[in-house]
Structure formats: structure tokens, C-alpha cells
């Protein structure tokens, strides 16, 4: 992902304030609520019967945290996202058979959650930088599909 110096600063400054457990759980939970077909990959997570059940599900929260911890690694390696996410791409492609479109959806949900959490601090330029990052991460995760 090519970010300007200002964009890198904006992304890393805001990310330093992110509670990965809270934001990760909310982002994954919202993905499962807003795009219910994504739930088929999480059938082992127990009760996904309603929005409240999903948002309160400890396995959803734990996996959301895991996802954002991986995203954090990507932020440290913006110049090598494909390398950073190669093993995860392989896992999601070959073993889990996740539709790569889901990575794009999750990235967009993450941007919405960040906007909700940070309000006025999540300015249009900050959003633009994050959109570049989540698109780059989604492309890296989809890499093994091509």
C-alpha cells in the first residue's frame, strides 16, 4: 500500500488509540449481522441467532481481537502486505474456502467502527488513508486465490 507520510502518521497515530479487543469484536460482530451469509464460516461459535447474540458472543469477540491483532501486524509491514498475510491467505483460501469478497466487507465494516469510535477525530483524510489500508489488506488476503 502506498501511503504518503501524512497518511502513515494519521493511520499509526489513530491505531495507537484503538482497543483491539473492543473494536475487533464489534467489527466482526457487525460483519456477521450486516452480512449474515458470512456466519457460515463461524458455525462452531455457538449462538448467532440474533444481533444481540452475535454482539455478545465471546467467541466472536475473541476472534475479532485475533483479526485486529493480525491487522496490526499489517500496519507494521505496509510495504509487504502480501508477505505478511501469505499464510493467512493460504489458510482462508485452501482450508476455509472463504470468499475473498468477505475481506473487503470486513475492511469496510472496520472503517465504520473506527468512525463510530473516534467521531470527529476520524476525519475524511484519515478515512481515506484507512480505506487504502483495508483495501491493501483485503488484496493481500485474496492473493492466494489468484
Swiss-Prot record:
The modification S-nitrosocysteine is found at residue 93. The modification Phosphoserine is found at residue 44. The modification Phosphothreonine is found at residue 12. InterPro entries: Globin, Globin-like_sf, Globin/Proto, Hemoglobin_b, Hemoglobin_oxygen_transport. It holds the Pfam family Globin. Heme b binds at residues 63, 92. GO terms for molecular function: haptoglobin binding; heme binding; hemoglobin alpha binding; metal ion binding; organic acid binding; oxygen binding; oxygen carrier activity; peroxidase activity. GO terms for cellular component: blood microparticle; haptoglobin-hemoglobin complex; hemoglobin complex. Heterotetramer of two alpha chains and two beta chains. Belongs to the globin family. This is Hemoglobin subunit beta. It comes from Procyon lotor. The gene is HBB.
